């Protein structure tokens, strides 16, 4: 099977650990957050048995917070080559791995305990030679701070290169159904394509994070995007039990995109991201099954003014949110005073 699927937390970290344990020659890792002790020990063990390991880490979050310091110290102590990600990009949010130049992992998950045990996440593995070579080519280019140009006919989707165009085309090609799982729905081009899909009769199921989890500077775009899609007939829910971290789209139960790309301008324009498109039946079938199960374990997001105010109270930001979003309930309250 050229493509296969790992579902988190259902499958646990075992498929990733087993793959690294099977590495014989080379291991290339690119990660936004790498703090999980099991994954770290597995990589250190690979180095100890003679595997050539290279690791590229994002040095810091947008706010300057660095999470990967202890991991970097441990890797370098084991004589593993570690580079910061390419400073050409605001962040390297890509999560991926290539083993023995034969198998590539395209992931939504960080290598941290939470993403491996508590969040809905996915990884697609590929053994297509041209896809693996392209992943290696990008890794080598970013490692050396050189220009990388994606292959036009590839199933790989890269940001900031062709991500927005490829995701827009994927949505445009849907005929009957679209199932989306993503943290952010903020990019106006993607929102426009989803609106057009709804208007041509595509049934759209959107799983999103609740509004109170959005950062203040993303609140207008995030809530606005969800409201626009709801108003044209898309169903908008939030997952119960698990935290949603996945970035996944399934079209017509025949094709899917999985990777690190949030549907936001920053992801498309300023960050190194990677996703993969697949039509492998066993992969798309399982993604569809998980999407349906998650939908059955979700609840509708109340996008009315009252519903948004109630949700925003969960972070003590109802007043700020009401003011920014021009919510009617807030306006009426001000008149009374």
Question: Where is each model-derived feature located?
Answer:
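PLD/PLD-like phosphodiesterase catalytic module centered on the HKD motif
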Residues: 1-17, 36-104, 109-151, 163-164, ...
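Active-site metal-binding motif and surrounding structural segment of the metallo-beta-lactamase
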Residues: 27
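An anion/phosphate-binding loop that grips the pyrophosphate of nucleotide cofactors and donors
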Residues: 23, 174
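Extracellular/periplasmic Venus flytrap/periplasmic-binding protein
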Residues: 157-172
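Cys/His-rich zinc-coordinating "finger/knuckle" motifs
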Residues: 30
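A charged, amphipathic alpha-helical module
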Residues: 153-155
């Amino acid at each position: 099977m050229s493509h296969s699927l790992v579902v988190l937390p259902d499958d646990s970290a075992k498929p990733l650990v087993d793959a690294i344990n099977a590495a014989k020659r080379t291991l290339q890792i690119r990660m936004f957050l790498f703090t999980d002790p099991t994954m770290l020990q597995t990589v250190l063990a690979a180095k100890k048995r003679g595997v050539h390991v290279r690791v590229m880490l994002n040095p810091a979050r947008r706010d300057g917070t660095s999470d990967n310091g202890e991991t970097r110290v441990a890797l370098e102590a084991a004589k593993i080559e570690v580079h910061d990600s390419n400073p050409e990009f605001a962040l390297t949010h890509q999560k991926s791995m290539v083993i023995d130049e034969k198998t590539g992992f395209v992931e939504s998950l960080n290598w941290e305990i939470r993403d491996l045990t508590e969040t809905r996440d996915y990884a697609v593995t590929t053994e297509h030679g041209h896809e693996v070579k392209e992943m290696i080519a990008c890794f080598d280019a970013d490692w050396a701070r050189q220009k990388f140009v994606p292959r036009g006919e590839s199933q790989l989707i890269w940001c900031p290169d062709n991500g927005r165009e490829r995701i827009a085309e994927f949505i445009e090609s849907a005929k009957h159904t679209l199932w989306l799982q993503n943290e952010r729905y903020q990019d106006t081009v993607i929102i426009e394509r989803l609106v057009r899909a709804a208007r041509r009769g595509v049934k759209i199921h959107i799983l999103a994070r609740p509004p109170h989890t959005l950062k203040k500077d993303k609140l207008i775009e995030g809530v606005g995007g969800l409201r626009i899609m709801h108003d044209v007939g898309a169903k908008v829910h939030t997952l119960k039990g698990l935290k949603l971290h996945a970035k996944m789209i399934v079209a017509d139960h025949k094709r899917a995109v999985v990777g690190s790309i949030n549907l936001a301008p920053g992801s498309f324009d300023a960050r190194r991201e990677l996703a993969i498109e697949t039509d492998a039946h066993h992969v798309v079938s399982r993604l569809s099954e998980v999407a349906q199960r998650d939908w059955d374990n979700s609840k509708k997001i109340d996008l009315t003014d009252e519903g948004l105010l109630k949700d925003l109270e969960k972070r003590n930001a109802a007043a700020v949110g009401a003011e920014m979003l021009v919510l009617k309930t807030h306006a009426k309250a001000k008149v009374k005073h």
